[in-house]
C-alpha cells in the first residue's frame, strides 16, 4: 500500500502592472510555504487563481477573458486583484467563479484556497521556498513595493477606489526585504508603489528601525539606505513633489541610478486642472533644467495622455511645445480611454476617437525624433549594461537609462561570454529611436 499523498496543485495567472506582480509573488510564496505546488498548466491544477487588473477598460476586458479561459480549462477559479473590487461586474459575466477578493487581500485568498483545496501535511523546513520568496522576475532584478494605495484623486484614475488611500510599509520591513533580495543575487531593485514620493506621508514620516538603527520613513531616507546595498536602485512612479529635488544629489553621487520615472500626464494648465494634477509647466521645466545641472547623466521617463475630455488643439500644442523644450529621454503616451467610475467620464467635450488617434500619432512622431537624438548622443561613449538575455548570437541588456519591459535595450552582437545579471562596460556603436548597439570593452 502506497503512503504517497497527493500534493495539491495551484495554477496562477498574474495580469497588470509590477505592483500586481508583487502581490502575486506574495500569494505564491505563501502557497509554496504551505506545501502547495504551483503548476503552469490548467489541466494539472486543482484550482486556478487569477490576479486581475482593472485600471482601464482594455485591462478589464483582458482580465475577464483570462477568468473565462481559466473557467473553461479548469472550472475551479478564485479571482483577486484590482478588478476583484468590482465583484458584481465579474459575477455578471462569470457567475461560476468560486470566490472574489479585492487587491492585496492575501489572507482572504489563502483562506479560500484552504476551503476548496485543503492544506497538505507539510513541514515548511523541508520546503525549497527561497528566503526572498517566490519571484516572477528573472533572478537578477526584482520589484520592491513600498506602499499600497494613493491619496490623489486624479479624474482619469480609479486606483484609490480599488486599492484605497496610501498605506506605507514599515521602513524596517522594506529594507529587510531589500537585503534578502540582494543576498539572493538580485543586482537591480526597482522601487514601486502607486506614489513613491509620498512614502511615509500617511505616518507623518515617523522614525522606524532597521538593524537597530533609527531610519526616517521617507523616500529620501529609503534611497540613502538602499544605496548601501551596492546594487542598482531604480525609482518608479514618482509624483512631482518638491522633495523629489532631494534625491537628485544621490543620483549625481552614484548612490542610486540617475533615472526618474515621473508621470506628468500633460502640459496644458487647463487640462492638468481637469485631471486634478499639479499644473505649473514653467516650474516643471525649471526643475528639469536644475536636475540636469546637478546630475547631467539623469534619464527622465514620463507618461502622457492625449485626447483627454476638453483637450483643444491649443492644449495639445502646449504638450508638443513642452516635449520640444523638456527633451525627455523615455516617454509613453496613451489615448484617453473612459474607465468606469472615473470622474473624467462626467466632463464635457469628449474628444472624438479619430482626433485622439491623430494627436497620438503626432505626439509619437515628435517624441521618436527626440528620443533618437538623445540616444545618438551616446554613440562613442562607454556605458554600464546589465545583461538580461544570452544566446548563441549574443547578449541583450539594459543601460542605467533603461527599466525592464518599458524602456529600450542594448544589443551586444556576438557577445556570448557573459551571464544573466552581469554588469559589463560597453562602448556604444549605433543607435535608433529606442535601442543601442555596442561591444564590450
From Swiss-Prot:
Pfam families given in the database record: Radical_SAM (PF04055), TRAM_2 (PF18693), UPF0004 (PF00919)
NCBIfam families hit by this protein: 30S ribosomal protein S12 methylthiotransferase RimO, MiaB/RimO family radical SAM methylthiotransferase
Chain positions recorded as [4Fe-4S] cluster 2 binding sites: 150, 154, 157
Keywords linked to the UniProt accession: 4Fe-4S, Cytoplasm, Iron, Iron-sulfur, Metal-binding, S-adenosyl-L-methionine, Transferase
GO molecular function per UniProt: 4 iron, 4 sulfur cluster binding; aspartic acid methylthiotransferase activity; metal ion binding; protein methylthiotransferase activity
Gene Ontology process terms (BP): tRNA modification
Residues the entry annotates as binding [4Fe-4S] cluster 1: 17, 53, 82
One Gene Ontology term, aspect cellular component: cytosol
Purpose: Catalyzes the methylthiolation of an aspartic acid residue of ribosomal protein uS12.
Compartments it resides in: Cytoplasm
Family annotation (SMART domains): Elp3 (SM00729)
PROSITE patterns: MTTASE_N, MTTASE_RADICAL, RADICAL_SAM, TRAM
Names of the cofactor(s): [4Fe-4S] cluster
Superkingdom in the source lineage: Bacteria
Protein name in the entry: Ribosomal protein uS12 methylthiotransferase RimO
Ranges of residues in domain MTTase N-terminal: 8-118
Amino acid at each position: 500500500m502506497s503512503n504517497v499523498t497527493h500534493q495539491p496543485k495551484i495554477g496562477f495567472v498574474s495580469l497588470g502592472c509590477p505592483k500586481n506582480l508583487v502581490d502575486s509573488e506574495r500569494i505564491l510564496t505563501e502557497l509554496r510555504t504551505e506545501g502547495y505546488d504551483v503548476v503552469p498548466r490548467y489541466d494539472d491544477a486543482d484550482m486556478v487563481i487569477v490576479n486581475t487588473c482593472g485600471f482601464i477598460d482594455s485591462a478589464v476586458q483582458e482580465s475577464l477573458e483570462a477568468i473565462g479561459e481559466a473557467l473553461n480549462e479548469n472550472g475551479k477559479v478564485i479571482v483577486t486583484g484590482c478588478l476583484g473590487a468590482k465583484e458584481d461586474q465579474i459575477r455578471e459575466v462569470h457567475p461560476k467563479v468560486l470566490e472574489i477578493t479585492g487587491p492585496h487581500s492575501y489572507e482572504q485568498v489563502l483562506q479560500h484556497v484552504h476551503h476548496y483545496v485543503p492544506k497538505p501535511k507539510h513541514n515548511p523546513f523541508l520546503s525549497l521556498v527561497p528566503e526572498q520568496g517566490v519571484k516572477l522576475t528573472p533572478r537578477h532584478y526584482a520589484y520592491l513595493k513600498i506602499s499600497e494605495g494613493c491619496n490623489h484623486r486624479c479624474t482619469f484614475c480609479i486606483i484609490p477606489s480599488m486599492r484605497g488611500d496610501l498605506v506605507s510599509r514599515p521602513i524596517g520591513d522594506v529594507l529587510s526585504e531589500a537585503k534578502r533580495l540582494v543576498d539572493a543575487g538580485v543586482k537591480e531593485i526597482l522601487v514601486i508603489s502607486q506614489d513613491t514620493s509620498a512614502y511615509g506621508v500617511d505616518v507623518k514620516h515617523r522614525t522606524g528601525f532597521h538593524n537597530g538603527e533609527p531610519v526616517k520613513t521617507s523616500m529620501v531616507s529609503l534611497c540613502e539606505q538602499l544605496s548601501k546595498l551596492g546594487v542598482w536602485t531604480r525609482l518608479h512612479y514618482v509624483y512631482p513633489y518638491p522633495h523629489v529635488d532631494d534625491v537628485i544629489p544621490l543620483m549625481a553621487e552614484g548612490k542610486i541610478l540617475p533615472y526618474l520615472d515621473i508621470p506628468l500626464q500633460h502640459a496644458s494648465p487647463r487640462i492638468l486642472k481637469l485631471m486634478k494634477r499639479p499644473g505649473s509647466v514653467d516650474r516643471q521645466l525649471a526643475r528639469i533644467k536644475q536636475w540636469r545641472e546637478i546630475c547631467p547623466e539623469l534619464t527622465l521617463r514620463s507618461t502622457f495622455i492625449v485626447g483627454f475630455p476638453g483637450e483643444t488643439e491649443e492644449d495639445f500644442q502646449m504638450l508638443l511645445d513642452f516635449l520640444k523644450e523638456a527633451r525627455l529621454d523615455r516617454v509613453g503616451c496613451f489615448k484617453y480611454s473612459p474607465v468606469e467610475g472615473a470622474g473624467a467620464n462626467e466632463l464635457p467635450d469628449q474628444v472624438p476617437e479619430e482626433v485622439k488617434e491623430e494627436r497620438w500619432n503626432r505626439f509619437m512622431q515628435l517624441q521618436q525624433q527626440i528620443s533618437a537624438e538623445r540616444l545618438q548622443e551616446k554613440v562613442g561613449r562607454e556605458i554600464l549594461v546589465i545583461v538580461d538575455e544570452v544566446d548563441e548570437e549574443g547578449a541583450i541588456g539594459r543601460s542605467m537609462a533603461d527599466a525592464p519591459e518599458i524602456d529600450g535595450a542594448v544589443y551586444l552582437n556576438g557577445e556570448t561570454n557573459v551571464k544573466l545579471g552581469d554588469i559589463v562596460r560597453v562602448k556604444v556603436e549605433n543607435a535608433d529611436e529606442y535601442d543601442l548597439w555596442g561591444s564590450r570593452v
